[in-house]
């Protein structure tokens, strides 16, 4: 029993250690730019620095430690976190939640795309800017070095991070220990800064500066960027490992670093461009720049991988067009590479670096996307607490308090809209337009298939009465998500009158859960003599390999005919959309053209379901929009 307990503890510590290299990369590198961004607005004196440090301390405690690690962690979807997981929990409880949930989900995904561009840009740029601390003459190399690092970062996505990923956690552990020690060395020289733990200084800061203090919250918010990753990566490491990593390593190191920067600037009141690098002794500065660059690369890798993961889930749920998905690891099922998304992120990130040129300028664009993402999380978890946990009104007030605090941060971020904050909003809006247009087009296809279902119902009767001649063999007809029960393929059979002796229609259903146990995965319905409908249920995080799944199904589900695997013939549908020029419900003409473009360029079923090319027949179907 004792050995089992020790083994369990070792496993938990191992997971906590691994989490350092993924979960805490973004929030762990915020000290590079966050504190310097805040202090530039005020003269350096005890009242201002204590007030800023107090705001930083209580922001990390209330929003990250209490909101995320205590409350939001309760809202996991079978151990999985993130906005799609939260939406899935709500859909399980509220069967028809309405358009508001779709709207929030699409906006949240759009913000994640923006975050995937901004995080690598500001993180790596802020690390390379340490060269200016070595020598002002090196300032001209900051931009090209940053772009070179970003180029190789996105280039290596196609080969995966399996081989180098094992070094992420050790590097981040060294990073946290280093910034903690550097901060501590400054605190012992000016220990009075620890008084800022008292919330009085945060309140006093607002009383002195009044409305202008609200503006500073936009800068303070930067210390929490990356906090949403703690919940998004829940499925990879679990609650206990992330909580241990945060409270034992990340949070103490961050607080020591921020308070150390506060102590340093109070002892050196001259203009300090990069207070973080000023903590480092001159002899250690080159090492610190290299370590900071490695840490920001790891932080950037984490957000890129998260973007791949969330967009893969969105693709499975048909929130976006089907994307080419490359699995870069034989051992880690969640390690995927999306070539198109990688290109978009790379182009966006490099463009941001060239346009803004410095981390200080980029900071204005950065915080607002994460702020909105956190607001969405608060709203969704509040709904879950009310509808799923049956929290009474008093407990729900906790969410109201958190919402007020986050809205105050959002108010502080609003002035940034004029100096770059509009960029993540624009990215999210463009992402929303793509996803909403795709959704509207899918709904139109569903409507057309419903009409076909009414026309083709008589085929079932003819099959039952043996009025249709059949040829030997078996056909597997893969039903698209917009097709309820294979009406389009049934319509094809009605037209050409080619019916196999045994026909199996296979429908893929993506559920609102991350994983579906094998015993609940398959569902067989006999529609007519020799005509079967099979539902295969997937979770939104699972990988689809239809031939492998069918092999498993044939072992578990009884079919009254023999299956010869190498002679199976798969039938899939290729959709062609023809424009009518008329405006239809929820779709303008430009949306119809855009949907037609997307569906033509989406990954075809044969790739998406990993079907054998030599045994697959594609049937083209035209639809009038």
From Swiss-Prot:
The keyword Lipid metabolism appears for this protein: no
Keywords: Cell inner membrane, Cell membrane, Ion transport, Membrane, Potassium, Potassium transport, Symport, Transmembrane, Transmembrane helix, Transport
GO CC terms: plasma membrane
Principal location listed in the UniProt entry: membrane
Taxonomy, superkingdom: Bacteria
Catalytic reactions of this protein: K(+)(in) + H(+)(in) = K(+)(out) + H(+)(out)
Keyword Glycoprotein: no
Transmembrane segments: 15-35, 52-72, 98-118, 134-154, 164-184, 212-232, 246-266, 284-304, 336-356, 365-385, 394-414, 417-437
Family: Belongs to the HAK/KUP transporter (TC 2.A.72) family.
Name assigned to this protein: Probable potassium transport system protein Kup 2
Taxonomic source organism: Legionella pneumophila (strain Paris)
């Amino acid at each position: 029993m004792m050995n089992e307990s020790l083994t369990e503890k070792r496993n938990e510590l191992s997971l906590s250690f691994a989490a350092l290299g993924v979960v805490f990369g973004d929030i762990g590198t915020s000290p590079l730019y966050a504190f310097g961004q805040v202090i530039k607005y005020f003269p350096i004196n005890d009242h201002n620095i204590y007030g800023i440090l107090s705001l930083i301390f209580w922001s990390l405690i209330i929003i990250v430690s209490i909101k995320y690690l205590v409350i939001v962690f309760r809202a996991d979807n079978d151990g999985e976190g993130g906005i799609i997981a939260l939406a899935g929990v709500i859909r399980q409880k509220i069967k028809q939640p309405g358009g508001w949930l779709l709207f929030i989900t699409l906006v949240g995904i759009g913000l994640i795309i923006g975050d995937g561009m901004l995080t690598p840009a500001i993180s790596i740029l802020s690390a390379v800017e340490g060269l200016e601390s070595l020598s002002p003459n090196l300032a001209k190399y900051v931009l090209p070095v940053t772009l070179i690092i970003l180029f190789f970062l996105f280039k290596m996505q196609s080969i995966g991070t399996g081989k180098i990923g094992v070094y992420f956690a050790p590097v981040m552990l060294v990073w946290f220990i280093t910034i903690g020690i550097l901060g501590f060395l400054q605190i012992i020289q000016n220990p009075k800064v620890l008084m800022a733990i008292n919330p009085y200084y945060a309140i006093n800061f607002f009383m002195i500066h009044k409305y202008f203090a609200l503006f500073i919250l936009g800068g303070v918010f930067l210390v929490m960027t990356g906090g949403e990753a703690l919940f998004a990566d829940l499925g990879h490491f679990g609650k206990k490992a992330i909580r241990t990593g945060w409270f034992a390593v990340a949070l103490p190191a961050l607080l020591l670093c921020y308070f150390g920067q506060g102590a340093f600037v109070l002892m050196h009141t001259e203009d300090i461009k990069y207070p973080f690098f000023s903590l480092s002794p001159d002899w250690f500065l080159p090492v610190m720049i290299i370590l900071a660059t490695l840490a920001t690369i790891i932080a950037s890798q984490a957000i890129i991988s998260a973007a791949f993961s969330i967009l893969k889930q969105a693709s499975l749920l048909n929130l976006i067009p089907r994307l080419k998905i490359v699995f870069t690891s034989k051992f880690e099922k969640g390690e995927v590479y999306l070539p198109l998304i990688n290109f978009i992120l790379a182009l966006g990130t490099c463009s941001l670096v060239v346009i803004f040129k410095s981390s200080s300028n980029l900071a204005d664009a950065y915080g607002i996307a994460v702020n909105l993402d956190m607001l969405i999380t608060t709203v969704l978890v509040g709904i879950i607490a009310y509808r799923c946990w049956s929290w009474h009104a008093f407990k729900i007030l906790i969410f109201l308090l958190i919402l007020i605090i986050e809205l105050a941060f959002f108010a502080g971020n609003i002035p940034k809209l004029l100096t770059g904050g509009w960029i993540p909003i624009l990215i999210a809006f463009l992402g929303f337009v793509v996803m909403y247009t795709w959704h509207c087009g899918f709904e139109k296809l569903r409507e057309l298939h419903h009409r076909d279902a009414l026309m083709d119902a008589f085929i079932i009767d003819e099959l039952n009465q043996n009025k249709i001649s059949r040829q030997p063999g078996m056909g597997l007809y893969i039903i698209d998500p917009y097709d309820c029960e294979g009406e389009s393929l049934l319509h094809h059979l009605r037209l050409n009158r080619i019916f196999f002796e045994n026909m199996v229609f296979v429908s893929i259903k993506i559920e609102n859960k991350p994983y579906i146990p094998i015993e609940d995965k398959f569902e067989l319905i006999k529609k007519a003599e020799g005509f079967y409908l099979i539902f295969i249920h997937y979770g939104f995080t699972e990988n689809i390999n239809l031939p492998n799944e069918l092999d498993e199904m044939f072992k578990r589900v009884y079919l009254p005919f023999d299956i010869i695997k190498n002679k199976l013939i798969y039938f899939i549908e290729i959709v062609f959309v023809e424009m009518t020029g008329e405006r239809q419900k929820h779709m303008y003409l430009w949306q119809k053209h855009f949907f037609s473009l997307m569906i033509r360029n989406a990954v075809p079923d044969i790739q998406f379901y990993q079907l054998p090319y030599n045994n697959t027949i594609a049937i083209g179907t035209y639809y009038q929009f």
